Amino acid sequence: MSVIRNILNSRSSKGGNFFNTLHKLLGFRPKDLSVYERAFTHRSLNVKDPSGNPINYERLEFLGDAMLGSVIASHLYQEVPEGDEGYLTKMRSKIVSRKHLNELGKDLNLIRFVKSNIPNDQFGVNIHGNIFEALVGAIYLDRGYKYCNRFIYNRVIEPYVDIETLEGRVISYKSLLIEWCQKQKKEFNYQVYEDTGRDELKHFAVKLWIDKKVIAKARATSKKKAEEKASKRAYYALQNKMN
């Protein structure tokens, strides 16, 4: 119990640096600092409550994801009355994309609050978006929907959500390319081939074929990333034909 208390309460005093920094970041006074401590606790600490349940940000991340989706959906519904379900879903996906959430987390420098047994430079890039979602979840638990809605509006919607700009933002180059190939009745294929790189991490190499011609090649640490990278290169190579 003392270990749990020390980890979660080490910064949880009102008037302390953690409280003051959070107050400035959120735009309002947090009430239950322990919720925010949990939002910045990484699973690598392997902390558990008396019932054996893990204490980390992952459940708050789930909650924050749902709150972001709800608030953004409500905003789009009110601001774009002419948008149908498909359009609104597409716009929401662009706003809450992993890339965008990572940028938000980086801009707020949330990683400075994270407690873990892993050096910060060894985290994957998605840590920034994950803890941003966890923070949103913590706000909801601490202050309710009103304050959560206000934070999302001030930090996400007002500075970043411009419908005209979003309409031109590509979520997935692979999806865009597949849609174009299908409309143009073109054959396409993503071929995984042997990667000859000497990186320590395993890489996947992909060739993108369109109408029996290699249009682009790419390599990355996952097949999905390599296919997206190849699709992006193909998109720019074929941009004049696709637009």
Swiss-Prot record:
A Pfam family matched in the record: Ribonucleas_3_3
Matching InterPro entries: dsRBD_dom, RNase_III, RNase_III_dom, RNase_III_sf
Assembly mode: Homodimer.
Entry keyword Transmembrane: no
Top EC group: hydrolase
Role noted for this protein: Digests double-stranded RNA. Involved in the processing of primary rRNA transcript to yield the immediate precursors to the large and small rRNAs (23S and 16S). Processes some mRNAs, and tRNAs when they are encoded in the rRNA operon. Processes pre-crRNA and tracrRNA of type II CRISPR loci if present in the organism.
SUPFAM superfamilies hit by this protein: dsRNA-binding domain-like, RNase III domain-like
Cofactor: Mg(2+)
Subcellular location: Cytoplasm
Lineage per the UniProt record: Bacteria, Pseudomonadati, Bacteroidota, Flavobacteriia, Flavobacteriales
GO cellular component: cytoplasm
EC identifiers of the protein: 3.1.26.3
Principal location class: cytoplasm
Keywords: Cytoplasm, Endonuclease, Hydrolase, Magnesium, Metal-binding, mRNA processing, Nuclease, RNA-binding, rRNA processing, rRNA-binding, tRNA processing
Protein name: Ribonuclease 3
Residues involved in Mg(2+) binding: 61, 130, 133
Reaction equations catalysed: Endonucleolytic cleavage to 5'-phosphomonoester
Keyword tRNA processing: yes
Gene encoding the protein: rnc
Residue ranges constituting the RNase III domain according to the UniProt record: 19-144
Active site: 65, 133
Family statement: Belongs to the ribonuclease III family.
BP-aspect Gene Ontology terms: mRNA processing; regulation of gene expression; rRNA processing; tRNA processing
Example of a GO MF term: metal ion binding
Positions of the DRBM domain: 172-240
NCBIfam families: RNaseIII
